[in-house]
Amino acid sequence: MTVDIKPEVLQPKEIWKDVVGQEGRYRVSTFGRILGVKYNRIMSQYESRPKTHYLYVSLYIKDRRHHSKDVKVHKIVMDSFSPNPNRDKFTDIHHIDHNKHNNNISNLVRLSNKEHSQLEMAYRKECKDKV
């Protein structure tokens, strides 16, 4: 299915793909933006849980219950642009610049839980040492 995205919505070098499991309903860009196909609009993102600082988007899930679900934007981006062949090993998604609002595909990488924990601890120690 092709969707004509409004020209004012497009950014240079931005690539769009269907959201995995929501084909034809939602599209995601390499910049971490989510498009609702029905109304051809960029969906708003929000911090559902302020302490985590991750951005979420509310997707309407068409199943037996017909409900909406808050989904992490970085997970949507990675699942759509970089499918995970080894879900047992690479369980976490890391923001390279540590900015959880930067969901550009170039800022995301899959890691094991152990690798991710080590990176985050080193980053926190580095931040603490600067204070």
Regions from the PLM with identified roles:
Residues 2-93, 97-131:
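Conserved recognition-core residues within compact binding domains
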